[in-house]
Swiss-Prot record:
Record-listed Mg(2+) 1 binding positions: D268, E282
Top class in the EC scheme: ligase
Listed name of the protein: D-alanine--D-alanine ligase
Broad class of the protein's primary localization: cytoplasm
């Protein structure tokens, strides 16, 4: 056993890698979690798999993990609920805390918060999934112009998203998104280039990694192209001049800090073709860590390999609240 392995075991103790879960993004989470687990174990970390869809919070507490790496995506893992449970249990965890996770999981709230901090985002409105009429849909299409992006505000991995290019397609696109949630986000389509910017750290120490540009066939960066296809082209670092690169990276850090993110996240943008203006799309607080994922790709360009990236993220694990005296007493009684 090397000194490095010994040091990591002593530093991190028993580590749980949480992946799988109950959201629509379970399949992606399984891929992310298996990659993270293997990476940590290859570094000598005492890491163990834990699937919250198959095991209870009581079992999580019984494992007595010293910290956990959250590799869950979507509801029940990326939306603040799990983070709250881990706070109650006093287990340090990776990624943003309760509030930042909850805000970032909600595309509507993310847009509102970031707009208030000067980060531009496409024009939008929110429609009720049950009461919106066909006439209202047509009215929105006429007001905003086509094409439009319709989204389920709390889903990710391109799940619950429809691009509507004709007035006749509004109802089908709306129905696709409405089956996931109580409201549907309608967003003005931005024609241009799709970018993503990983951000690592916290507060003043938050730093943006190299920008990744995503070029999917016919611009169709859907679930299949995102995780399984080899047809999508990724350019990292994205081919922009230094001034524009720094501008987008600064916007990414501003958005990250605006919602209160810590540890790591990924900030997605569209750059409008007509005037090269960037627009925030969303913030992912538990980004994918699969073989096709963008954070590892960007980190590699910056000089950090997959295993070392996992270690850096794990090292940032924390709880936001200090354990109460009651929790400290319970710990002493164990």
């Amino acid at each position: 056993m090397t000194t490095t392995v010994q040091n990591l075991k002593a530093e991190f103790g028993k580590v749980g890698v949480l992946f799988g879960g109950r959201s629509a993004e379970r399949e992606v989470s399984l891929m992310s979690g298996k990659g993270v687990l293997a990476a940590l174990q290859s570094k000598g970390v005492d890491a163990h798999a834990f699937d919250p869809a198959e095991r209870s919070l009581a079992e999580l507490a019984a494992e007595k993990f010293d910290r956990v790496f959250i590799a869950l995506h979507g509801s029940y893992g990326e939306d603040g609920t799990l983070q709250g449970a881990l706070e109650q249990l006093g287990i340090p965890y990776t990624g943003p805390g309760v509030m930042a996770s909850a805000i970032s999981m909600d595309k509507v709230m993310t847009k509102r918060v970031c707009l208030s901090h000067g980060v531009p985002t496409p024009r939008f409105t929110v429609l009720d999934a049950e009461t919106t009429s066909a006439a209202q849909l047509q009215s929105v299409a006429a007001e905003f112009g086509l094409p439009l992006m319709l989204k389920a505000p709390h889903e990710g991995s391109t799940i619950g998203i429809a691009k509507v290019e004709t007035a006749e397609g509004m109802q089908a696109g709306f129905d696709l998104c409405a089956k996931y949630e109580a409201v549907v986000l309608v967003e003005q389509f931005v024609k241009g280039r799709e970018l993503t910017v990983p951000v690592i750290g916290s507060g003043r120490n938050a730093r943006a990694l190299p920008i990744v540009e995503i070029r999917a066939p016919q611009g169709n960066y859907d679930y299949e192209h995102k995780y399984f296809s080899n047809d999508t082209e990724y350019l990292c670092p994205a081919p922009f001049d230094e001034a524009f690169t720094k501008r987008v990276q600064a916007l990414a850090v501003s958005a990250f800090n605006a919602v209160g993110c810590t540890g790591w996240s990924r900030v997605d943008f569209m750059v409008r073709a007509s005037d090269n203006e960037p627009f925030l799309l969303e913030i992912n607080t538990s980004p994918g860590m699969t073989s096709h994922s963008l954070v590892p790709m960007s980190a590699k360009v910056a000089g950090t390999g997959y295993e070392d990236l996992c270690i850096e993220i794990l090292r940032s694990a924390k709880t936001e609240l200090k354990p109460s005296s009651h929790m400290q007493l319970q710990e002493q009684e164990r």
